[in-house]
């Protein structure tokens, strides 16, 4: 990609595999993100989105060995704001060093785990000339997601209801991702002129075949048991059992990842009466089409399926229509990001997210997409580019901006300065 990362030798040592306990090694010394770049798609100075008290927007509970964070903005589907991140991060850092805290549990109050951040407020702030503030807010969200991705104690995400965007970023990189019957998982960014960030590129590139590329480009929602079938979730537990699972995890009083896994299995379901949405035939089409490096070739391959009389023609037609509704820049950048991330470490994925975010927030599709989808609600954004993108045309989106020449830092303040835990393969289970 023509870009060298200024990463220490410790960071280059990837593939570290976690065995019985996440406590064996310490984490920190992150790649750190400079103040002009960091994230939460929730908002900053706007009082509607910037809570004056974090105590009620994030509930914190200590229950035996469990430390439980409940996102508590049910009226806005637990959309994440800056105060919430500022409440969660210091506690996570402190708990990482605590001998009493054994397992972290993340959950959402009401019918949503988290719908992500407030992109409407971000777009309005950009229009008001506050792009640096938006970048700073976005970077805070990356910092939280990276902290969870490299956390040295087991984390369990109870993905009730809507789990999307930045909310997905809280869950996708932790070792235990528990779906239930009403889970709705998605990264919907290509429909608003942005890209699949929070290192979703790392996660998606490690799902079976090219299913992750399909999810990233189409913003497809994956529901319920399909989350387990496709690898998005590690377990499926009926929602009414969540409180009982939480109690059992607290009683364990251990950070042994195998014991935690076995405990979750006590509550898990291993079969579903609902048929799979993504059948082997559908997956075959996805793999044959979304393996292409250029989005124009992906669309061409789908059109070939759409033109025949097979049972898969309707799926292909629908997918082409979906892709044409997305920002051409967004799907092209997302495609390249996910394909490239297959070779990256987790921290490299976050690093490039900061760089790509810098450029994507500058280009007009983000404000246009958010305006059409969420403000005027015309649902018909006028994208700035055509679909004639090629892989090589996207090089500039991955070049370090000159104002970041002093480096990109997304360290969580206060984490110990020991070698960064970095990996290319998820070190769980």
UniProtKB/Swiss-Prot annotation:
**EC numbers, comma separated:** 3.1.2.4
Catalytic reactions on record: 3-hydroxy-2-methylpropanoyl-CoA + H2O = 3-hydroxy-2-methylpropanoate + CoA + H(+)
Residues recorded as binding substrate, renumbered to this chain, are 141, 166, 189, 197
User: Keywords in UniProt for this one?
Assistant: Branched-chain amino acid catabolism, Hydrolase, Mitochondrion, Ribonucleoprotein, Ribosomal protein
GO MF term list: 3-hydroxyisobutyryl-CoA hydrolase activity
Enzyme group, top EC level?
hydrolase
What CDD domains is this protein classified in?
A: crotonase-like
Q: Name one Pfam family in it.
A: ECH_2
Task: Extract the SUPFAM superfamilies matched here.
Answer: ClpP/crotonase (SSF52096)
Give the matching Gene3D superfamilies. Answer: 2-enoyl-CoA Hydratase, Chain A, domain 1
Q: In which pathway does it act?
A: Amino-acid degradation; L-valine degradation
Q: What does this protein do?
A: Component of the mitochondrial ribosome (mitoribosome), a dedicated translation machinery responsible for the synthesis of mitochondrial genome-encoded proteins, including at least some of the essential transmembrane subunits of the mitochondrial respiratory chain. The mitoribosomes are attached to the mitochondrial inner membrane and translation products are cotranslationally integrated into the membrane. mS47/snr1 has enzymatic activity in vitro, and is able to catalyze the specific hydrolysis of 3-hydroxyisobutyryl-CoA (HIBYL-CoA).
The entry assigns this protein to a family as follows: Belongs to the enoyl-CoA hydratase/isomerase family. Mitochondrion-specific ribosomal protein mS47 subfamily.
Quaternary form?
A: Component of the mitochondrial small ribosomal subunit (mt-SSU). Mature yeast 74S mitochondrial ribosomes consist of a small (37S) and a large (54S) subunit. The 37S small subunit contains a 15S ribosomal RNA (15S mt-rRNA) and at least 32 different proteins. The 54S large subunit contains a 21S rRNA (21S mt-rRNA) and at least 45 different proteins. mS47/snr1 forms a protuberance of the yeast mitoribosome and retains a solvent-exposed cavity likely capable of accommodating a substrate, in accordance with it being an active enzyme as well as an integral constituent of the mitoribosome.
Protein name in UniProt:
Small ribosomal subunit protein mS47
Q: Which organism is it from?
A: Schizosaccharomyces pombe (strain 972 / ATCC 24843) (Fission yeast)
What lineage is on file? Eukaryota, Fungi, Dikarya, Ascomycota, Taphrinomycotina
């Amino acid at each position: 990609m023509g870009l060298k990362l200024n990463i220490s030798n410790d960071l280059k040592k990837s593939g570290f595999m976690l065995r019985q306990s996440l406590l064996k090694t310490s984490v920190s010394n992150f790649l750190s993100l400079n103040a002009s770049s960091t994230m939460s798609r929730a908002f900053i100075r706007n009082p509607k989105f910037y809570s004056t008290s974090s105590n009620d927007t994030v509930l914190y509970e200590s229950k035996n060995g469990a430390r439980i964070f409940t996102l508590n903005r049910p009226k806005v589907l637990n959309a994440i704001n800056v105060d919430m991140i500022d409440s969660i991060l210091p506690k996570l850092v402190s708990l990482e060093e605590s001998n009493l805290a054994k397992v972290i549990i993340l959950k959402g109050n009401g019918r949503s785990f988290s719908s992500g951040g407030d992109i409407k407020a971000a777009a309005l702030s950009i229009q008001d000339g506050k792009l640096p503030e938006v970048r700073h807010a976005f970077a805070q969200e990356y910092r939280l997601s990276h902290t969870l991705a490299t956390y040295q104690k087991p984390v369990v995400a109870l993905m009730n209801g809507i789990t999307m965007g930045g909310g997905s970023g809280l869950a996708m990189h932790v070792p235990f991702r528990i779906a239930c019957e009403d889970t709705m998982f998605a990264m919907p960014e290509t429909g608003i002129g942005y890209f699949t960030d929070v290192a979703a590129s790392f996660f998606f590139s490690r799902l079976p075949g090219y299913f992750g590329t399909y999810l990233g480009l189409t913003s497809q929602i994956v529901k319920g048991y399909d989350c387990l079938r496709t690898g998005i979730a590690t377990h499926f537990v009926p929602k009414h059992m969540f409180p009982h699972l939480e109690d059992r995890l607290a009683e364990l009083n251990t950070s042994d990842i195998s014991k935690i896994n076995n405990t979750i299995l006590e509550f898990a379901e291993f079969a579903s009466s609902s048929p799979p949405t993504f059948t082997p035939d559908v997956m075959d089409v996805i793999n044959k089409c979304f393996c292409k490096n250029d989005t124009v070739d992906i669309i061409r391959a789908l059109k070939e399926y759409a033109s025949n009389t097979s049972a898969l023609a309707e799926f292909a037609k629908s997918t082409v229509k979906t892709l044409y509704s997305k920002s051409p820049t967004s799907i092209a950048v997302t495609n390249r990001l996910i394909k490239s991330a297959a070779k990256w470490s987790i921290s490299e994925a976050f690093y490039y997210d900061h760089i790509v975010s810098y450029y994507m927030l500058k280009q007009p599709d983000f404000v246009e997409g958010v305006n059409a989808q969420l403000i005027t609600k015309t649902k018909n954004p006028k994208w700035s580019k055509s679909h004639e993108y090629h892989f090589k045309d996207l090089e500039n989106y991955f070049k370090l901006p000159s104002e970041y020449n002093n480096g990109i830092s997304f360290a969580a303040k206060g984490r110990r300065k020991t070698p960064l835990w970095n990996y290319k393969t998820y070190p769980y289970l």
